[in-house]
Amino acid sequence: MIINNIDWLIMFVQSGSPFLTRSDGSVTLGMTDGRTKTIYLDDNLRGLMLDRVLAHELVHAFMFSYDIHIDIEFEEYIADWISLFGRDLVYLLDNLMQNLR
């Protein structure tokens, strides 16, 4: 996958993998590594949960790729919001653009 001319990988790893362990020791379902340009996902993710976790991690990949640095709590808020509502926003925009004028 390419974001802003930067190649990124998506890798599925086992639950509890070191790649899914945060700096505070907690384990997560997805992790984005800006150094290796890799999104790591728990290989047990399926369906809607996979969709939401991948959308969340893509936000982090876009932030890294466009060299955007904001407070981590705000970045997490944006990533969560987009994982929940981003697709609705884009579909609405597409529909509006097709029907304007």
For each feature predicted by the language model, list its residue ranges.
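Metalloprotease/metallohydrolase-associated module, dominated by Zn2+-dependent proteases
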Residues: M1-M49, S65-R101
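Active-site recognition of the HExxH zinc-binding catalytic motif
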Residues: R52-F64
